[in-house]
Structure formats: C-alpha cells, structure tokens
C-alpha cells in the first residue's frame, strides 16, 4: 500500500498484455495442441481402425474411409501427394489373448514408444527389434511368419518414437485444407428425424405398414399385433375342429395314419416337424434306413480304393446256402474323399470390380469343393447379390434372387465344417449362408466387418485377398428397406485360377508314372544279373581288383614254380594242374551255357 500504487494503471492495453492475456492469447488457445497420432488410429478419421491399410510412407488408414476419399480428391490425406487405390497395402495386426496389439514373434505389446514396422509383401506387422535381430543381422531376408522373401526396401515404418514429426495431426493436408467426405450415415441422420430413435423390429414394420392395404385388412379383422392375430386364428381353428367332430360322430373311427418312410426320415433325423417328438424308435430306425437307401452325400472328387478288409462274400456263401458260392476273397472297395493340402483361388468379375478369393481347401474341403465346382460350371455367372447390410455383410449365390433358392453340387444340403482356425474376424471373410445347422447350399456372404457372433454357426471357407476397394464400393451402394441393393451388384463371370482337387489327380498320375518307371528299371537290373551275373565280377577280377585278388596271385606264382621243377612229370601232373587251373578260373558265377 503506497501513495503511488495506481501510477501504472493505464486506460489502454499494452502489446504485451494483448499477446499474453487478452485477444492474442485467445487465438492461441483455439488452435489444436501438438499431438502425435497413435499407431492404432486412422490418419483420416483419427479413430481406431478395424481393417487397416497403409501407404508406402507408413500412414495408416481405415479401408472404408480412405477409398471414398481417394475417389473424391485423388490425393494423399497426409502429404497431399497424388494417391491411387492400388497404392494401398493391407496390414495384418496381431492380437494377444487380452486383445492387445503385439509382435507375433517376440510377443511384445505395442505402445507409443515401440518402433513398429510392416513387411510390404505380406502386410504382417512386427516390432523393429524382431526384424533387426532375426532378419537384418543374420541377413535372412525371409518373412518371419510366412517365409516369403523380401528386401530391405519392403520395410515400412508404421511408428518410430524417435521421429514423430510425420505424425503431427495439425500438419495433415486434409486438416489444413478442411477436406471431408460426405458420409451417407450422416446424411440419413440429418434427413430422417427418427434416425436416432431405437425401436424394435415389430414397431418398425408396424410404422412402415401404416396407411397401406395390409393395415386396412388387419384393422378389418380386429386389429392388434401378432399375438392378437394368433389368438383369433386359434379360436377359429377350435371352432372348426368342434364342428368336424360333430359331423364325424356317426362315422366309424378311422385308423391312425401311419408315417411314411420319408416323413419319418424328415421328422426324426432333421426334427423340423411337430411329429418328430411323437416318433418312436421304429420310426427313427425307418428314418435311418431311408437316409441310407437315399445315399449319402458323395463328393464329386472322390474315388474307390481297396481297403485292408475283405468283402466277406466267401464266408457268407460258406455259412449260408442263400448266397451264391464264392471261393475267392476280394478286398472291399471303400470311398475315399480327396482332401487337398493346398489353397484354391477364384476371381469374381462383378459390376463394381474384381474380387480375388482365397479358398481354404485344406481346412473346409467340402465347402470349397462345392464352391469351386459351382464356379467351374458357371452357376454364379449372372447371379446378383440380393442382400447387403452396411457394416455387416453382403450375401449372394442365389440364382432366384430371393434368398430362398440355390442348391449344392450334390443336389441336397451338406454338413457344416466348423473349425477354430477359421473365424468370422476381419474384413473380407467368405462364409456359407444357411437357414439352420447343416443346411448349406450355394449361397454365401462376404463380411464388411468382424462378426464373432456367427462363429461355429456358419462355415468359413475363404477370404478376399484382392479387391478390397471393390468390396468398399459394394458397401456404399444404397439399399431399400429389405436390404436389397438399389443398384444392381452382379457377378459377371467366375473364374477358377487354382483348383487343388484336379491338381491332386494330376499329381497322383505323375507319381504313379514315376513309380512304374522306377519299377521297370529295377526289373531290368534283376534280369541282366540273372542272365549274365558273372560279367561284372570277371571284369573286376581281370583288372586286379575285387575279392580274392591276392589268392589268385598266389595260385599263379605257385603254378610257375611247379612247372619249372617238375618237367619230368608233365604227362601226369600237368593234366591235374590244368584241371585245377581251369577249375580256379571258372569259380565265378555264370549262366549255364557252358554245360
């Protein structure tokens, strides 16, 4: 407190006060503070990605957002350089049991301080430490998971904690220029006032039926929902049943209608009718017999081979006079399904682009066999996708286009093939559509997004490995209330690139031919030895090698000494020597031509 305490109180604001406290300071607060983009977020929406792709500079995007952006602006959202859809590289991030992204080799959880790299040729993501220790230092330029060759130029840096300048969000091109894409969901939300109202399916159908002829008919019969209509139908059925009983009082009681073999089969095996619960053991036995007589689902690519068991025809004919006598036991022929160990590849040429599909023939052989055979027969040519749900899936494979048609190559449904290796996780998963357990036909669907609730309920048999931009274009097609695309999405032609089922036959024929060729060579060797077995040993002995060469040398020396000392006895002893010499010379194995 002094007498000059208000001497610095001015009637204006100084430049320093303006820059640090007043108007100038407010403009700084409105700016986005410095922040580096996390590795698990899309560089376009700044939200966590689900189906990531990246560019050669390491910028990561969500496939569903980057494709429309490229189509509209045609440039890189971060750098502003020209960019095409072909320049996008799909990434494969691996998660641990707790759902955290980690390195699949060292099992280290990724953090904001982890140096993360991706291999361009495969798309797998690793920590740089694993690549450095196991690839760069050892000069082993093979991918650590797939063993595919790559070069050092194929390494893409996703995150480098020592260089965060390229991940500053305020420096992105789309942030500086305010570039945005028109979201269809946002348009619907702005145009439809009831978009954010969460209603059940019955209420939605009821609101859609207001003012229609169907609503008038329901009101004419008393109105109400499904429960009221079912109660009225039950009451009418009870009245009609009582009337029919009154009319049949005078008639003799009719015997209970028996089940036919086909009805019993459908009732007891599939359990789809109300009579299935009433079916007894005899009906179930008849059902099994009917299914056996109808024949099981024989794979197209199967063959009959001999088993290690006999057919039993000889024993049956020996113990029973009802069979024709058989004196020869033949091996029983059994059916062997061909389960290839390779992958299959199919391409769909659609109205919105090409889809390249990899088929897991080694894990789901029957579903893949059905799919490949239908593609080869041209079954899918000209067939449209009749159902598409955004952020879920697109369904097709029905020639009728109703979702109720289509059949398998066997003319009947085939069983599911659930496997823990194939789950509904990730974008582009191809799975069989069905109406219940073991009801697979020709219909299939492709996922836009992971759907774990479908695991072990539908058979996963493939995945999209090329054409994710085409899949994104399909997802953006508007649909009507019944999820049918307003713009036709049709399969123009289905081409089979690799069919492991036919390649299996070719490999077997090739192996069989090589085996027969080797057997012929062995037979020739055995025949030459048997007809002239001493040819090789005689030549070997003449050259001074082989077994017994020292014994032959000693015998020849002894013969020379004997000739020099016993000249007087040449008439008698010489004959015996000649015989011995002849015997010793003919000790080798020969044929019987000299006899």
From Swiss-Prot:
Residues 35-108 form the U-box domain. Residues 510-525 have a biased composition (Basic and acidic residues). Pfam families: Pro_isomerase. It catalyses: [protein]-peptidylproline (omega=180) = [protein]-peptidylproline (omega=0); S-ubiquitinyl-[E2 ubiquitin-conjugating enzyme]-L-cysteine + [acceptor protein]-L-lysine = [E2 ubiquitin-conjugating enzyme]-L-cysteine + N(6)-ubiquitinyl-[acceptor protein]-L-lysine. GO terms for molecular function: peptidyl-prolyl cis-trans isomerase activity; ubiquitin-protein transferase activity. May catalyze the cis-trans isomerization of proline imidic peptide bonds in oligopeptides thereby assisting the folding of proteins. May also function as a chaperone, playing a role in intracellular transport of proteins. May also have a protein ubiquitin ligase activity acting as an E3 ubiquitin protein ligase or as a ubiquitin-ubiquitin ligase promoting elongation of ubiquitin chains on proteins. This is Peptidyl-prolyl cis-trans isomerase CYP65. It comes from Arabidopsis thaliana (Mouse-ear cress). The gene is CYP65.
